[in-house]
Amino acid sequence: MQLLARANLIFGLHVHVGIPDRETAIHVMNQARYFLPHIYALSVNSPFWVGHDTGLKGYRLKVFERFPRTGIPDSFESLSEYTDYCNLLVKTGCIDNAKKIWWDIRLHPFFDTLEVRVCDAQSRVDDTLAIAALIQALISKLHKLLRQNVTFRIYRRRLLDENRWRASRYGIDGKLIDFGREKETETRNLIHEFIEFVADEVAELGSRREMNHIERILHEGTGADRQLAVWERTQDIKAVVDHIVAETYQGLSEVELAAKATVAS
């Protein structure tokens, strides 16, 4: 990858959710694609690049898009179609294995998981847990509905990309397209609908405490919003970095902090 790889100084949050049957996992992946911009909007945490305000809440994916085989994947009719796609790439020397497929969501080639890769890394532990809980509840919900032969319309990647761009640009402060209603809707409202959609799974999974934190994100803003607030106040990128460091320590126990101090010394 040459300079592309050397310049790829970005950090993402990848969440794995187990689905033992890979045929089922492909169909769950098809359904989950629609929700990726909603999840990304909650997770945006990369408004700066090389010390400059990019004007985007999430710039990380724009950096990563320089790589091949990124973004929201196309839908696949079956595991066989997906396997044929991967085998063709290996046969023609594009990749040596399917781990070189870096989509926003993918069927992991070695683990029996769906891996959601769209999110920016979070600076607060509670934000990380909340987003992971939302993803877990979504995959569980879609898996359960699929077993009941309930599915949703599969939208084209190019339509989903419109929402992905909006999430990158505005985070939770913008609007996403509600394709079912064919109109723009406040992102926060769609996320509230999302939370209601998975509410029964949250209760079953016992992740209510983690999920409740999403309301805090919606109220206080994303990691990107907090970084930009520091920037607006100080016009000092070092102050932004100090803020990120301070947030990273929030939620860590005294034992964990002591262990970090020991390693550092």
PLM regions and their residue ranges:
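Metal-dependent DNA replication initiation modules
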Residues: 1-13, 17-20, 26-73, 77
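C-terminal accessory/tail domains of diverse enzymes
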Residues: 3, 64-265
